[in-house]
Curated annotation (Swiss-Prot):
Protein name per the record: tRNA pseudouridine synthase B
NCBIfam families xrefs: TruB
Catalysed reaction, written as an equation: uridine(55) in tRNA = pseudouridine(55) in tRNA
SUPFAM superfamilies in the cross-refs: Pseudouridine synthase
Keyword Isomerase in annotation: yes
Organism: Chelativorans sp. (strain BNC1)
GO MF annotation, one: tRNA pseudouridine(55) synthase activity
Active site: residue positions: 49
GO BP terms in the entry: mRNA pseudouridine synthesis; tRNA pseudouridine synthesis
Disulphide bridges, residue numbers: none
UniProt superkingdom: Bacteria
Gene transcribed to yield this protein: truB
Family per similarity comment: Belongs to the pseudouridine synthase TruB family. Type 1 subfamily.
EC number: 5.4.99.25
């Protein structure tokens, strides 16, 4: 019987709130971080376009089990729309497909914003990761295929006009839910204003529950790794940038366990929830032992039932 090979890398776990530089793809960024930390596992919580900069939460080790909770969180973007041109990629990267000399005025732009707030239908860009017949839309688009992508419902909490730095450019900030494409937003606003438009600059500033002040530039990680004299020093310096795995679970009730209950949970068994403030019912909650995440599960009739156990 073949033996399972030993996993390569360190069993390091936690969240890194990376400030991704423009020009680097999300998958490349994850690979870079995984290599720097020598981690066994790594994954991100929501693709950020290569031309975009900003917040890319990256999960290491056991934290990858909490990625879905961050994926569902609200996101905030600051972006610049260049009016007068529509491009194949809906950003600066693609060739111009339509153009117009009209320049929208501030009054018309502001009047348009309520139309893009709340639940709206949005069609993803041709160059997107949406799957069409089992293939990514961007792969089909690169082959010259124009594909029909179905519109989908997305939620926009707010869309604000921040400034108009020059007549043909406007800066916006949007808070939106999962699946929203800022490039589609720019394209659609341009069409509604009768002047076309594309994203000229894009930065993600927040991914709930993480905050701007938690951002770590890639160059800081590379500098910390380069300055370390030993591998031990390197990993110690890098690990100081990590947030605890449970940082992704903000908003879920915490069930505080003792040693005996934690032992039962680790074996996949339910336990009675104790404590004056403990919930009797909760569709999702996380259990902790001395502040460390043990499991995610549900509380039903005063019992915590684990769904996912962590090896932290």
């Amino acid at each position: 019987m073949a033996r399972r090979g030993k996993k390569k890398g360190r069993a390091v776990s936690g969240w890194l709130v990376l400030d991704k530089p423009a020009g680097l793809g999300s998958t490349e960024a994850v690979s870079k971080v995984k290599w720097l930390f020598g981690a066994q596992k790594a994954g991100h919580a929501g693709t950020l376009d290569p031309l975009a900069s900003g917040m890319l939460p990256i999960a290491l080790g056991e934290a990858t089990k909490t990625v879905p909770y961050v994926m569902e969180g609200a996101k905030v973007y600051r972006f610049t729309v260049a009016w007068g041109e529509e491009r194949s990629t809906d950003d600066l990267e693609g060739p111009v497909t339509k153009s117009c000399d009209k320049v929208p005025v501030e009054e018309d732009i502001r009047a348009l914003l309520p139309r893009y707030t709340g639940l709206i239908m949005q069609t993803p860009p041709q160059f997107s990761a949406v799957k069409i017949g089992g293939e990514r839309a961007y792969d089909l688009a690169r082959e010259g295929e124009v594909v029909e992508i179905a519109a989908r419902e997305v939620e926009i909490g707010r869309l604000d006009l921040i400034s108009i730095p020059e007549p043909k450019k406007a800066v916006f900030e949007v808070e939106c839910g999962k699946g929203t494409y800022v490039r589609s937003l720019a394209r659609d606003m341009g069409r509604d204003l009768g002047c076309f438009g594309h994203v000229a600059d894009l930065r993600r500033t927040e991914v709930y529950p993480f905050e701007t002040q938690q951002l770590v530039p890639l160059k800081d990680l590379e500098g910390a790794a380069a300055d370390a004299e030993t591998e031990s020093d390197r990993f110690s310096a890098l690990d100081s940038y990590l947030l605890d795995t449970e940082a992704a679970l903000d908003g879920l009730p915490e069930i505080v366990l003792g040693d005996d209950a934690a032992g039962r949970i680790r074996l996949g068994n339910p336990v009675i929830v104790r404590g004056r403030d403990a919930p009797v019912q909760a569709p999702e909650a996380w259990a902790s032992l001395r502040g460390r995440l043990i499991a995610i599960g549900m509380v039903e009739a005063g019992m915590f039932k684990p769904k996912r156990v962590f090896g932290l």
